[in-house]
Curated annotation (Swiss-Prot):
PANTHER family: 54S RIBOSOMAL PROTEIN BL35M, LARGE RIBOSOMAL SUBUNIT PROTEIN BL35M. One of its GO terms (molecular function) is structural constituent of ribosome. This is Large ribosomal subunit protein bL35. GO terms for biological process: translation. The lineage of its organism: Bacteria, Pseudomonadati, Pseudomonadota, Alphaproteobacteria, Hyphomicrobiales. GO terms for cellular component: cytosolic large ribosomal subunit. Disulfide bonds: none annotated. It comes from the Bacteria.
Length: 67
């Protein structure tokens, strides 16, 4: 059976750390910033670590060979 391919969209959106955690950009920053609090905008600026169950799903289904 051939190897499962890595999803190209997932390569661009997620990064796996050395310890196996999955990093992604914070959500909610596309539009509508005027009604968001300054704290929300500041916290959503960088990357965030996905919850462990979500990270395992991403690795299993979309990034089987890592990055």
């Amino acid at each position: 059976m051939p190897k499962m391919k890595t999803k190209s969209a997932a390569k661009k959106r997620f990064k796996i750390t050395g310890t196996g955690k999955v990093l992604s950009a914070a959500a909610g920053k596309r539009h509508g910033m005027i009604k968001r609090s300054n704290k929300f905008i500041r916290n959503a600026r960088g990357t965030m670590v996905l919850a462990e169950p979500d990270g395992k799903k991403v690795i299993k289904n979309f990034l089987p060979n890592g990055l």
